[in-house]
């Protein structure tokens, strides 16, 4: 059941409440009573995008969580250091951007643990939102907080304009929302255009 549920996450802008209730044991949204929205970035750090994202966040005095592919963090250690030095949080996004549903439990956990030797964090987000139920249980048993999202920007999709993404975000964002963006090659042009507009709207 867990495998079937999460495989459709990248297709959705907002995760339906019934799906969140069905797939328990992960964080979809933070405290709805708090007037705070949580901005997250997946797939970095890379020099083509992450520094510009950090510059924009600094300009608006906004903190975010970066779910890093550890292979990238090893390649660009100064970016990992900069993210932490500027007060942002770091999460584990596996070492090799590994899709859980395509790998055994042992291989998946080993990849995450290898990543954690670099990233040193208890926050985890599965690439593409895909993992099996047994992988989820194993990670929780090891003390990881599995953080998904309730609003996905689709900034990686060239078929969506920034204007369209903003309209959808305005429709779905709410108190405690976790918004997922990407600091990746594929998304960088749209991410860097979207981010200032998104922050100005949220502020």
Question: What function would you assign to each model-found segment?
Answer:
Residues 1-13:
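Helix-enriched interaction subdomains in cytosolic or periplasmic regions
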Residues 10-92, 96-99, 107, 120-121, ...:
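Active-site beta->alpha N-cap acidic-glycine motif
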Residues 54, 77-81, 109-116, 136, ...:
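Generic structural signal for well-ordered alpha-helices
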Residues 68-73, 96-99, 130, 152-157, ...:
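Short histidine/acidic/glycine/proline-rich micro-motifs that form metal-
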Residues 130, 135-172:
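His/Asp/Glu-enriched short active-site or ligand-binding loop at hydrolase and phosphoryl-transfer sites
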Residues 169-203:
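Catalytic grooves of carbohydrate-active enzymes
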């Amino acid at each position: 059941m867990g495998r079937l549920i999460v495989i459709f996450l990248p297709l959705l802008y907002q995760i339906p409440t019934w799906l969140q209730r069905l797939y328990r044991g992960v964080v979809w949204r933070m405290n709805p009573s708090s007037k705070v929205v949580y901005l997250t970035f997946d797939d970095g750090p890379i020099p083509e995008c992450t520094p510009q994202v950090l510059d924009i966040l600094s300009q608006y005095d906004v903190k975010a969580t970066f779910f890093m592919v550890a292979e990238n963090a090893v390649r660009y250690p100064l970016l990992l250091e900069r993210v932490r030095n500027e007060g942002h949080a770091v999460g584990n996004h596996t070492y090799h951007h590994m899709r859980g549903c395509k790998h055994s439990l042992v291989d998946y956990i080993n990849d995450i643990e290898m990543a954690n030797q670099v990233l040193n964090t208890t926050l985890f987000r599965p690439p593409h939102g895909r993992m099996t139920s047994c992988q989820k249980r194993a990670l929780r048993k090891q003390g990881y907080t599995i953080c998904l999202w309730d609003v996905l920007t689709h900034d990686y999709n060239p078929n969506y304009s920034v204007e369209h993404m903003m309209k959808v975000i305005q429709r779905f964002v709410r108190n405690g929302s976790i918004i997922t963006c990407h600091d990746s090659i594929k998304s960088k042009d749209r991410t860097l255009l979207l981010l200032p507009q998104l922050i100005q709207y949220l502020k």
